């Protein structure tokens, strides 16, 4: 036939049986990829340290999605929370991966069957004997079934009525676990960070889908609307389906990048805005202040800070610190986190506490500046030593650690003080193992960044696809060169412009 690559799908345009076959094969490919990818990730995933080496640091992409839907255990005997399990059953990571691969195989066979037996009675119009599909009716069926699935997910799976619930955590990503969620029917259900909104919205949207599906099954579209929206043309279905997909892709790109109850930071890593706003830093200082108010020493107060919370407050976990073409997991960048060294407190020789100004997200290098509690610059690491006034040596800066591995250790030699001041620009200080994975020291993005980039990019491409196919179906007659007045009788000489009734000649 010699079709160009971008027109090869025309072979299934008027062939409902084989159109169905290629869609089943596509489902087989998607499901097969999901199952295979899950098995690959499970083969390389190290569950031994859920605090300092969680799934998102290791670049896991499908494991977080399984986990947020309630899968936490492995046939390998480990649990995502760090415990051990004995009999996880079919609803384990490997079990779900296996069911996807089995389903993929069944879809593969079904696709072959439908490709061979393409000329089914159900696809032919009984009046004309030609292949045809009742698209409005099919739309109603699909809407109804999607509504049932949506309602079932919200009413049973999420609520724990018949299912595990979903991953729920606190605002700082410390206490996450799979649990049942009650629907939130008040205004709080519209807060994207309230898990109850997931249940209530699925129940509401599912109910609407069921009712809309029944409506479209029982009511035929008006003739003008049917013709105006080209409801008899399969390319209309393609165009509107692409619209639904690109809209969903834009939405999930937003919920992933800005954060929401559907994208917990324990599974996908923190968002860049949590670094920009000092979100975890504020919580750490609040906890330390509370500890001091309870008459704890500074060392005791800092020692009570969970290592998990301190680790979030580190720029290497900011998904916007990755770069274009920097492939690999976060662990391949700055290394595998081994332990928290503790919180460094800097003081000048007058005893003032100094704070290192943190590096903004989009900087690769940043001057080392130490300010007091009023924001006045008191010390720095100068670019030109000859002109320096605030150098660590001149100001006599010392550093003492509270909490972590270096708890109670202090340094006064300028080289060591400057080393820890530089590292403080990047948030809390961690010991990182760069040898094991031959990590190159260049920051990588988390799966949060990859997911957002991928979905935003494809959403844009699919938006153009929607415009393209929508225009093709709406203006099909124009593109085909069919003029509604093509067979009109034209009297030569009557009009100045042939066939244009607005230019009638006046009789002299």
Swiss-Prot record:
InterPro entries: PS_antenna-like, PS_II_antenna-like_sf, PSII_PsbB. One of its GO terms (biological process) is photosynthetic electron transport in photosystem II. The chain crosses the membrane at residues 21-36, 101-115, 140-156, 203-218, 237-252, 457-472. Its main location: plastid. Binds multiple chlorophylls. PSII binds additional chlorophylls, carotenoids and specific lipids. SUPFAM superfamilies: Photosystem II antenna protein-like (SSF161077). It is a multi-pass membrane protein. Keywords: Chlorophyll, Chloroplast, Chromophore, Membrane, Photosynthesis, Photosystem II, Plastid, Thylakoid, Transmembrane, Transmembrane helix. One of its GO terms (cellular component) is photosystem II. It is found in: Plastid, Chloroplast thylakoid membrane. Coiled coil: none annotated. The keyword Glycoprotein does not apply. GO terms for molecular function: chlorophyll binding; electron transporter, transferring electrons within the cyclic electron transport pathway of photosynthesis activity. PANTHER family: PHOTOSYSTEM II CP43 REACTION CENTER PROTEIN. One of the components of the core complex of photosystem II (PSII). It binds chlorophyll and helps catalyze the primary light-induced photochemical processes of PSII. PSII is a light-driven water:plastoquinone oxidoreductase, using light energy to abstract electrons from H(2)O, generating O(2) and a proton gradient subsequently used for ATP formation. PSII is composed of 1 copy each of membrane proteins PsbA, PsbB, PsbC, PsbD, PsbE, PsbF, PsbH, PsbI, PsbJ, PsbK, PsbL, PsbM, PsbT, PsbX, PsbY, PsbZ, Psb30/Ycf12, at least 3 peripheral proteins of the oxygen-evolving complex and a large number of cofactors. It forms dimeric complexes. Belongs to the PsbB/PsbC family. PsbB subfamily. HAMAP family: PSII_PsbB_CP47. This is Photosystem II CP47 reaction center protein. The lineage of its organism: Eukaryota, Viridiplantae, Streptophyta, Embryophyta, Tracheophyta. The gene is psbB.
């Amino acid at each position: 036939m010699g079709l160009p690559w971008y027109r090869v799908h025309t072979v299934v345009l008027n062939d409902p049986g084989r159109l169905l076959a290629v869609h089943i094969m596509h489902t087989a490919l998607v499901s097969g990829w999901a199952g295979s990818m899950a098995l690959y990730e499970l083969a390389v995933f190290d569950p031994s340290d859920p605090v300092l080496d969680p799934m998102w640091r290791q670049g896991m992409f499908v494991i977080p999605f399984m986990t947020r839907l309630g899968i936490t255990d492995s046939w390998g005997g480990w649990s995502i929370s760090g415990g051990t399990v004995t009999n996880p059953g079919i609803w384990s990571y490997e079990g779900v991966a296996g069911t996807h691969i089995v389903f993929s195989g069944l879809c593969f066979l079904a696709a072959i069957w439908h490709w061979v037996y393409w000329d089914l009675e159900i696809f032919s119009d009984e009046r004309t004997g030609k292949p045809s599909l009742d698209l409005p009716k099919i739309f109603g069926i699909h809407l109804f079934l999607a509504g049932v699935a949506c309602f079932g997910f919200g009413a049973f799976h999420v609520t724990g009525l018949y299912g595990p619930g979903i991953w729920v955590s606190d605002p700082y990503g410390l206490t996450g676990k799979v649990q049942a969620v009650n629907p939130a029917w008040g205004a709080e259900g519209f807060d994207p960070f309230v898990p109850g909104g997931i249940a209530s919205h699925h129940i509401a949207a599912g109910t609407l889908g069921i009712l809309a599906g029944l409506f479209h099954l029982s009511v035929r579209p008006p003739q003008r609307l049917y013709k105006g929206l080209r409801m008899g043309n399969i390319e209309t279905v393609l165009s509107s389906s692409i619209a639904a997909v690109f809209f969903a892709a834009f939405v999930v790109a937003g919920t992933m990048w800005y954060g929401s109850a559907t994208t917990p930071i324990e599974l996908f890593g923190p968002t860049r805005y949590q670094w920009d706003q000092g979100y975890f830093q504020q919580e750490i200082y609040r906890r330390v202040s509370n500890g001091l108010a309870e008459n704890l020493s500074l060392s005791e107060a800092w020692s009570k800070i969970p290592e998990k919370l301190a680790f979030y407050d580190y720029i290497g976990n900011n998904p916007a610190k990755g770069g274009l073409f920097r492939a690999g997991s976060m662990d391949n960048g700055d290394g595998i986190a081994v332990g928290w060294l503790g919180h460094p407190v800097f003081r000048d020789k007058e005893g003032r506490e100094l704070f290192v100004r943190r590096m903004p997200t989009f900087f690769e290098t940043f001057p080392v500046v130490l300010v007091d509690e009023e924001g006045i610059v008191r010390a720095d690491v100068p670019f030109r030593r000859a002109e320096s006034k605030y150098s660590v040596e001149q100001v006599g800066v010392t550093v003492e650690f509270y909490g972590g591995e270096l708890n109670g250790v202090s340094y006064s030699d300028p080289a060591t003080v400057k080393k820890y001041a530089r590292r403080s620009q990047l948030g809390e200080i961690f010991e990182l193992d760069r040898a094991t994975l031959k990590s190159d020291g260049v920051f990588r993005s988390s799966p949060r960044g990859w997911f957002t980039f991928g979905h935003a990019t494809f959403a844009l491409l699919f938006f153009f696809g929607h415009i393209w196919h929508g225009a093709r179906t709406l203006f099909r007659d124009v593109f085909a060169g069919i003029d509604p007045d093509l067979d009109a009788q034209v009297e030569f000489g009557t009009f100045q412009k042939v066939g244009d009734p607005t230019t009638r000649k006046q009789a002299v």
